[in-house]
Amino acid sequence: MCGRRLLFLAAFGCLLANAFSLPATRNEEFDDGFPESEFDYEERHTREIPAQAYAPPIVYNSQSSYSPAKDQGYSAPAAPVYSPAAPSYSAPAAPSYSAPAAPSYSAPAAPSYSAPAAPSYSAPAAPSYSAPASSSYSAPAAPSYSAPAAPSYSAPAAPSYSAPASSSYSAPAAPSYSAPAAPSYSAPAAPSYSAPAAPSYSAPAAPSYSAPAAPSYSAPSAPSYSAQKTSSYSAPAAPSYHAPAAPASSYSAPAGPSYSAPAAPSYSAPSYSAPASSYSALKAPSYSAPAAPSYSAPAAPSYSSSASPSYSSPASSSYSAPAAPTYSAPKAQSYSAPAAPSYSAPAAPSYSAPASSSYSAPAAPSYSAPAAPSYSAPAAPSYSAPASSSYSAPAAPSYSAPAAPSYSAPASSSYSAPAAPSYSAPAAPSYSAPAAPSYSAPAAPSYSAPASSGYSAARAYSAGSAAPASGYSAPKTSSGYSAPASSGSPAASSYSAPASSTASSGYSAPASKSSGYARSEMDHQILGMARTAGGYGSAAPSAAYGAASLPSPPCPKNYVFSCSSVFTPAPCSQGYGY
């Protein structure tokens, strides 16, 4: 054993001496048995033969430990046997990390992340919120809540929401909710809005607005709500739905008289019902345009008054603030940024899950729960008081908090975190390259369009947001999603850097690493392999490689001398000293 080790050390020393005393032949360290002309660097270079094919051992044995073996016939294996190791470990580096990134995360991105986005999040939106809105909230809207629709939501509805408002929600609006407004919604609160609450807005609240919140309201977000986001729901949210916040007492007492009148002039929201069906189609044109003019103005006068305490406070803090900070900012940071980074990609997983957890949860617990218990019960016993305490408080804490913390945090923590860590890492390898092949393809057909146009528009959307300056633009730029982008250094490193950093080091490196091995490493006495190796199994690539931030464990000192090192690539970091 001792003799063998001594021989090995002697060979090692000889190799080192040769390596440093014969720099001209440094590229022939592992080709003792071959003529120099066949393996000299220049010829290799001209023939475009990757350096890995000749100097792979260096990857693990910094050219010395494995070299001596080469001398004794272990050398031959070194070149051929360990050489494959190089190609193996080298090629894998390129194809493995490269291809996996593209195909692995790409394919999943496309079918898994893409399809979900479209069918899962999209479909629900249409059927869930559409149908419910139509049958559940629509029907009630017509007879019960119709009047408001006519005068109030009619005008706003004019372009997009108009038709629904007109025919569906308009006609009913006049007779039904018009007169009822005072008597109806007052007393109706119990009978009129109560009953509707149960069948119309109540049931809808739970099934329609509740479920929709997650599935339905989610999908609309992408196609319909996305477009609207900028013009319609964004601006409205702040000015329109916020203004409602003002009429605190209005919605409280108004429940009877106030909500009655408002009902007429603006249950913009009412249209929100009919739109359900519309909300699908309308989503883009209808809810979009209406959102701005219709839902916006209505929000102020109609739902505004009422909104104040009940829906207003909500509007302000809850649905209003949300609108501006939450639903507006969300749009910017949450719904907006999402639109771009978040909602685009998230749409499927992120916004999908968020939709459930973030927007869904809020929607469900916040807007849903409130809708059912708060908006439902209040409707019956009192839309007035509930409006104030019930829908107001819920709105404020429930939809407000969700909006800010929930929808914001989601954007930041929930939506951001996903974006950063979850979507970030993917963003790098997955979303970066995949973005092109994987998420791009999906993006194109499934969510890419949104990602591309949507996501690009998201950028434009940001501009669009700019239109809704503070509500939409600021939030966007603000910390909501910018922070994620920023704090979402993930966004920067995760989402932006991923593309950049990943594309650069994580993704680009692999690609470049290949040729880097061939040229750079050979040129730099092959010892530079450690650098690339470091890049390969170290932090950045590590994170990018496995979408995990845990770096590979360092190889044991004797790894290079084990059999597995010859036949299989090292499952550990090949740093300096190996």
Curated annotation (Swiss-Prot):
Keywords linked to the UniProt accession: Disulfide bond, Extracellular matrix, Secreted, Signal
Region (45 X 8 AA approximate tandem repeats of [PS]-[AS]-Y-S-A-P-A-[AS]): 72-452
UniProt domain VM: residue ranges: 549-578
The keyword Hydrolase is assigned to this record: no
Cell location: Secreted; Secreted, Extracellular space, Extracellular matrix
GO terms, molecular function: structural constituent of vitelline membrane
Summary of the tissues where the protein is detected: Secreted into the perivitelline space and becomes stably incorporated into the vitelline membrane (at protein level). Expressed throughout the follicle cell layer of stage 10 egg chambers.
Cleaved signal peptide residues: 1-21
PTM summary: Becomes part of a disulfide-linked network including other vitelline membrane proteins, including Vm26Aa and Vm26Ab, during vitelline membrane biogenesis and maturation.
Region listing for Disordered, in residue ranges: 133-442, 487-514
CC terms in the record's Gene Ontology section: egg coat; extracellular region; vitelline envelope
Complex formation: Interacts with Vm26Aa and Vm26Ab; forms part of a disulfide-linked network within the vitelline membrane of stage 10 egg chambers.
Main function: Major early eggshell protein secreted by folicle cells into the perivitelline space and incorporated into the vitelline membrane. Localized sulfation by pip may be involved in embryo dorsal-ventral axis determination.
Protein name as it appears in the record: Vitelline membrane-like protein
Gene name of the encoded protein: Vml
